Regions:
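Detector for intrinsically disordered, low-structure N-terminal pre-sequences
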Residues: 2, 20-21, 33, 45
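Cationic, low-complexity basic patches in intrinsically disordered or flexible, solvent-exposed regions
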Residues: 6, 15
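Ala/Thr-enriched low-complexity intrinsically disordered regions
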Residues: 13, 29-31
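Bacterial N-terminal signal peptides that target proteins for export
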Residues: 16-27
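C-terminal motif of bacterial Sec signal peptides marking the signal peptidase cleavage site
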Residues: 36-39
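C-terminal PAP-associated
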Residues: 43-446
Length: 446
């Protein structure tokens, strides 16, 4: 029965999974945690291990089977004491002491607030919170569900929020899995996401594609959404669906978007501010695809994360892409990184980030590159110490442009997830001026 359930879950969409587990009656302790290095003085544990004390701070917890999870986090680029975060379905977290204590509130909008939170800040301390739409409040029972991607903005550190804006798009179709990028020192907000003709449809005529839009006035208005992926996928929300689009903008003004499709990682480039796009480039393979099974995780996501080095260091301009896959077997999920030193024209062979012996699972990675140092930080779940589903959280960091990584366990104790609980699709990490704040989900019980 256990094996059957694992196979069954592989074919469930994310939203089907959320509906099913939300109807179960089980006792689960859910928590969102953030890693703090106490007494950092603008240095983190990874820069001076002996001078700091690791502490895991619980931001939020719940007995609800669908959340809080899918945390997103951002350190203010101008005041590292200010840290903001979000989680499904509508939670907003605010800290003004570097993440030691948190205030919790909920977003509201007439467009509906329904998960997939992405939270980012600009250089004026404005906060942007992107999420899925649920305008009638009836979610899966209404055709207007997922009819756009909404970005709400706060200009007073989360005390108040506008109702949200959104790019012009086809509201008959479904819109999901967005991400934001805010170039330093600008009013620009970049957003990419997946458009489904009909989410979860098995009809081969229904297709998926990657869309992009940009705002040049702090998310007040948006350019019309444009399709940038040359190949379209299915709508099943699996490896044959075009998903996991992340945008970045590099120092020369070029915009890049990466995503996964059909066991490959794709990259597209625009040199005119997102108006026109080039031919999609395959920059890495992803054997086993971006969605795969890990024991006790009903759905595991290995979608790629792209970033670049905007520091003045020796690796300035280098682009990085990070992902997870099962190229070494279904019992050996690993974390990978590839890099480009020629503006995305060519990419290195994959570099294995986790430094354990083969045969254990590492999964759910997320990456950030500190713009002040160029150091790379990757957070992920790790089972190297166990023969069962017990799970730790690790931070890997590189000071040499991704050539080598040091791995450090940052969770205080392991947890064991439950297959009947929606665990989300991602965690997050933010790195600014040597301050590192990874955030992750913990689930115990059942």
């Amino acid at each position: 029965m256990f094996v059957f359930q694992q196979i069954l879950f592989s074919f469930e969409t994310k939203h089907d999974y959320m509906k099913r587990v939300g109807q179960l009656s089980i006792l689960i302790t859910f928590a969102i945690c953030v890693f703090i290095a106490i007494g950092c003085h603008r240095k983190t544990i990874v820069e001076s291990e002996s001078a700091n004390i690791i502490e895991t701070i619980k931001i939020d917890s719940s007995l609800f089977q669908v959340g809080p999870c899918e945390p997103s986090i951002c350190i203010s680029p101008i005041n590292t004491d200010i840290v903001v975060a979000g989680s499904i379905l509508d939670k907003f977290y605010f800290s003004q002491d570097g993440g030691k204590t948190w205030n919790i509130s909920r977003l509201k909008s007439t467009h509906g607030v329904y998960g997939d939170p992405v939270i980012r800040m600009d250089s004026n301390n404005n906060i942007y919170y992107a999420h899925l739409a649920n305008p009638t409040g009836r979610a899966y029972q209404d055709e207007e569900f997922l009819n756009k991607i909404v970005v709400q903005k706060s200009t007073d550190l989360g005390k108040t929020w506008n109702n949200g804006t959104y790019p012009e798009c086809d509201s008959i179709k479904d819109h999901d899995k967005q991400w934001l990028y805010i170039p330093d020192g600008t009013n620009e907000v970049l957003m990419s996401w997946t458009e489904f003709d009909k989410y979860a449809s098995k009809d081969t005529k229904d297709r998926s594609r990657i869309l992009f839009s940009i705002s040049d006035d702090g998310a007040e208005t948006w350019s019309p959404a444009v399709a940038i992926s040359d190949l379209e996928g299915d709508c099943i929300d699996g490896d044959l669906t075009t998903e996991g689009a992340l945008p970045i903008k590099t120092a020369d003004g070029s915009i890049y978007v990466s995503w996964s499709f059909d066991s490959k990682i794709y990259l597209d480039k625009s040199s005119d501010g997102g108006k026109t796009w080039g031919v999609d480039k395959v920059i890495a393979t992803q054997p086993g695809g971006w969605t795969f099974d890990v024991p006790a995780i009903g759905r595991c996501n290995g979608m790629p994360i792209i970033d670049s080095d905007s520091s003045n260091g020796s690796h300035k301009g280098t682009m990085y892409i990070n992902w997870a896959d099962q190229r070494n077997g279904v019992e050996d999920t690993d974390i990978w990184l590839a890099k480009s030193t020629d503006n995305g024209e060519s990419w290195s062979d994959p570099i294995r980030v986790n430094d354990d012996a083969p045969g254990k699972h590492q999964f759910f990675s997320w990456m950030d590159v500190d713009p002040s140092t160029g150091y790379i930080y990757i957070v992920f779940y790790d089972r190297r110490a166990y023969d069962d589903a017990q799970t730790d959280v690790y931070l890997a960091y590189s000071k040499d442009g991704g050539q080598t990584f040091i791995n450090q366990k940052i969770s205080e104790k392991p947890f064991t997830p439950n297959t009947n609980v929606f665990f989300g699709d991602y965690n997050d990490i933010s790195a600014v001026n040597g301050i590192i704040r990874p955030v992750w989900t913990v689930a115990n019980g059942g």
